[in-house]
């Protein structure tokens, strides 16, 4: 069982397998999520992350395994019996209802008094910065506002577990940024145990306590965002979590040797390691006009990205990607520089 820490588990998935015919989309997955944590499922298309979410919701029954919420086995229960709310990519709002009616619909189905519903709708709208929008309709508000209404509709029911199925994928970049901040703020404010699915790495990092990366139905790595980026467990993880330059290296007690260039050995590298493959993040490499011959490189491609350039260099016959601050240097193809590799952006890779 993969757990986030020593806290008591609130949502548990035990040996979950899901097959569609001969196709196994979840392969013996185990996970335990503590109360109040936000965990994001991240991975390439078809990795099984949405199927995991649907299984927790009760929309997809596992072929094998059990799902527990707050200590109770809910594997055979419907979504209505699990005390769960789900925020969808498509918002799933009723166009013939006002926003207030949309948000209060769940309470109405539970038979709550009208006065209570009206009051809680006002409170929910205030939470998502839409005070006074009760009487508007879906076609009168923007996509970002529609997603806020969908979030308010989920929060008003005070569920034990909140699920998010790629909720920001239909929004533009600026709206995605503000909306993910609002989601994280409210999740922490109400301490709701949450499971979030996205294919966007930056979104996963911004909203999550922990990120679980999947590939081909299996867990590749689970950890805090910084851990996954700085200490990827495999080649797949190194490449999936961002750009990585990968080179063979040898080690001494105090240095890492790559093509004769000696770099101070980072803290945390295993003792006794003599040779391996290392990954280097692009932001850990800088260019200089001075250095040793082993550091000399030639620029082959330059792409302007606004605040920075993405630069490809040829180094000892190998291509390397790095980032250059646009206010400090203006690189051009054919220019010769000396590169410097900073230990903080280096990690040892397994051969997976």
UniProtKB/Swiss-Prot annotation:
Part of the ABC transporter complex FbpABC involved in Fe(3+) ions import. Responsible for energy coupling to the transport system. Pfam families: ABC_tran, TOBE_2. Keywords: ATP-binding, Cell inner membrane, Cell membrane, Ion transport, Iron, Iron transport, Membrane, Nucleotide-binding, Translocase, Transport. It is found in: Cell inner membrane. It catalyses: Fe(3+)(out) + ATP + H2O = Fe(3+)(in) + ADP + phosphate + H(+). This is Fe(3+) ions import ATP-binding protein FbpC 1. InterPro entries: AAA+_ATPase (IPR003593), ABC_transporter-like_ATP-bd (IPR003439), ABC_transporter-like_CS (IPR017871), ABC_transpr_MalK/UgpC-like (IPR047641), Mo/tungstate-bd_C_term_dom (IPR008995), P-loop_NTPase (IPR027417), Transp-assoc_OB_typ2 (IPR013611). Belongs to the ABC transporter superfamily. Fe(3+) ion importer (TC 3.A.1.10) family. The keyword Disulfide bond does not apply. GO terms for cellular component: ATP-binding cassette (ABC) transporter complex, substrate-binding subunit-containing. Gene3D superfamilies: 2.40.50.100, P-loop containing nucleotide triphosphate hydrolases (3.40.50.300). The keyword Cell membrane applies. Its EC number is 7.2.2.7. The complex is composed of two ATP-binding proteins (FbpC), two transmembrane proteins (FbpB) and a solute-binding protein (FbpA). It is a peripheral membrane protein. GO terms for molecular function: ABC-type ferric iron transporter activity; ATP binding; ATP hydrolysis activity. The gene is fbpC1. It comes from Pectobacterium atrosepticum (strain SCRI 1043 / ATCC BAA-672) (Erwinia carotovora subsp. atroseptica). It is an enzyme of class 7 (translocase). ATP binds at residues 43-50. Residues 11-241 form the ABC transporter domain.
């Amino acid at each position: 069982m993969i757990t986030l820490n020593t806290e008591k588990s609130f949502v548990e998935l035990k040996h979950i397998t899901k097959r569609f015919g001969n196709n196994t989309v979840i392969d013996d997955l185990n996970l335990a999520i503590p109360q109040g944590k936000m965990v994001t499922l991240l991975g390439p298309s078809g990795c099984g992350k949405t199927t995991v979410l649907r299984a927790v919701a009760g929309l997809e029954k596992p072929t094998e395994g059990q799902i527990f919420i707050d200590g109770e086995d809910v594997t055979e229960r419907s979504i209505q019996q699990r005390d769960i709310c789900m925020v969808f990519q498509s918002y799933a709002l009723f166009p013939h209802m006002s926003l207030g009616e949309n948000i209060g619909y769940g309470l109405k189905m539970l038979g709550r008094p009208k006065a209570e519903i009206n009051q809680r709708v006002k409170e929910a709208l205030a939470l998502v910065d839409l005070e006074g929008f009760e009487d508007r309709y879906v076609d009168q508000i923007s996509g970002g506002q529609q997603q806020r209404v969908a979030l308010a509709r989920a929060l008003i029911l005070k569920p034990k577990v909140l699920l998010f199925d790629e909720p920001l994928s239909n929004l533009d970049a600026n709206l995605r940024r503000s909306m993910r901040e609002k989601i994280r703020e409210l999740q922490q404010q109400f301490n709701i145990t949450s499971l979030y699915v996205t294919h966007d790495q930056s979104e996963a990092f911004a909203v999550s306590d922990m990120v679980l990366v999947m590939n081909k139905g299996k867990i590749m790595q689970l950890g805090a965002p910084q851990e996954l980026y700085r200490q990827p467990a495999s080649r797949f993880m190194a490449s999936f979590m961002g750009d990585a330059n990968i080179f063979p290296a040898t080690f001494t007690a105090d240095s890492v040797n790559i093509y004769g260039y000696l770099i101070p050995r980072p803290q945390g590298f295993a003792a006794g390691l003599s040779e391996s493959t290392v990954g280097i993040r692009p932001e850990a490499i800088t260019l200089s006009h001075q250095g040793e011959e082993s550091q000399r490189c030639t620029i082959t491609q330059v792409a302007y990205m606004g605040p920075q350039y993405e630069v490809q260099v040829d180094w000892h016959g190998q291509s390397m990607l790095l980032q250059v601050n646009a206010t400090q240097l203006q690189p051009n193809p054919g220019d010769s520089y000396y590169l410097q590799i900073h230990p903080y952006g280096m990690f040892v890779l397994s051969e997976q």
